[in-house]
Amino acid sequence: MRTIADLPFIDYADPAYAAAPYEWLAEQALNHRIARSDRGVELLDYNLCRAFVLDRTMGTDHGNLVEKMGIPESRALTFKRRMLLTQNRGEVRQRLRGALTGLIGPKQAGDLREGIAGVVSNLLDALPDGVVDLKHAFADLVPAGVYCHWVDAPLSQARFVSEMSETVLAIFRRDPSLTPRIVAAYDELFAYAADRIAARKQAMGDDFLSQLIRVQQVGALSESELEDFAVMLIEASTDNTAASIAIIIDRLTAQPGVWAAIANDPTLAIPAV
């Protein structure tokens, strides 16, 4: 029987990766559908990745990760314990899914598109002239800005949201020296979420947080579950989306003809991506 140790090894310290990462990864994918690296197991085939994501026998083993990181008794640990209950397919998950199903539909998707367009437009207008770190000044702030839109917070708070998201997601680095920072960040996040919830309760609107509050007020969510969702949205607000935005812009600007075509016909953006 083959083990992980038998998988081919790919080395991200290879100078060729630093010089041309996309081309290097494409070459690795031609040779291997699955490999290993210093980061762990690497899935290099799209269909294989999709199969793993959809496979109900696969799990993140987040409980083991929390234990390995040595998260102490804290708001962070309490939150993680509650979130683990939502990752199985039992009663808690089914109840929460049922409570939230009505919040995502065609109308909400349309409103979100309009909100995203506003966030992107405002962030682009705020970019300084000259050379700029687009990942830091734009890509990181798009998903964080969308979170601000969800909770009716000013866009000026997007940097805080982005930094907190990055800090709590550092748990996946599996470096216990980061644990104190992660725990402190969760304390800040729960305080922030509580402030936003209190503010929206005083002036309810059509934003996503107001809708969550209404679900809680009819008894479909507990107060702690409402806060958990507000924090969970921050947790996931930056990492993959911000990285994807930066990668897409990098690749498209490397192809000026494609970039110009999209500028002339925005409907080409989706097939280009």
Region locations from a protein language model:
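Cytochrome P450
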Residues: 1-273
